[in-house]
Amino acid sequence: MMALTKIEIAENLIEKFGLEKRVANEFVELFFEEIRSSLENGEEVKLSGFGNFSLREKKARPGRNPKTGENVAVSARRVVVFKAGQKLRERVEQASSQS
């Protein structure tokens, strides 16, 4: 399984829209910075046709160190959650059924 990188996204922008490399890289960085910044500020990020990024509060809980078996406390924290939108789910399903 391959992974799409930010560099590859920028290269696709260069190919499809004829952007300069610097502009394409800056565009990609700014796009992801907007998502990061919004999440840091507690905002949900909704990308129509793609999905939603939101924050979920996780409570503190007891845990166990898998190497030593020692009981440890896992502190409360905020985690980022992504929920794929309907259109994205349909396209992924369609692509997987064709392969």
From Swiss-Prot:
Alphabetized SMART domains for the sequence: BHL
Keyword Nucleotide-binding: no
CDD domains, sorted: IHF_A (cd13835)
UniProtKB keywords: DNA recombination, DNA-binding, Transcription, Transcription regulation, Translation regulation
Keyword Transcription regulation: yes
GO molecular function: DNA binding; structural constituent of chromatin
Database matches in InterPro entries: Hist_DNA-bd, Histone-like_DNA-bd_CS, IHF-like_DNA-bd_dom_sf, IHF_alpha
Assembly: Heterodimer of an alpha and a beta chain.
Transmembrane stretches, start-end: none
A GO biological-process term: regulation of DNA-templated transcription
Highest taxon of the lineage: Bacteria
Organism: Mannheimia haemolytica
HAMAP family for the chain: IHF_alpha (MF_00380)
Encoding gene (name): ihfA
Gene Ontology CC annotation, any one: cytosol
Pfam families: Bac_DNA_binding
SUPFAM superfamilies in alphabetical order: IHF-like DNA-binding proteins
Protein name: Integration host factor subunit alpha
Protein's job: This protein is one of the two subunits of integration host factor, a specific DNA-binding protein that functions in genetic recombination as well as in transcriptional and translational control.
Family, similarity comment: Belongs to the bacterial histone-like protein family.
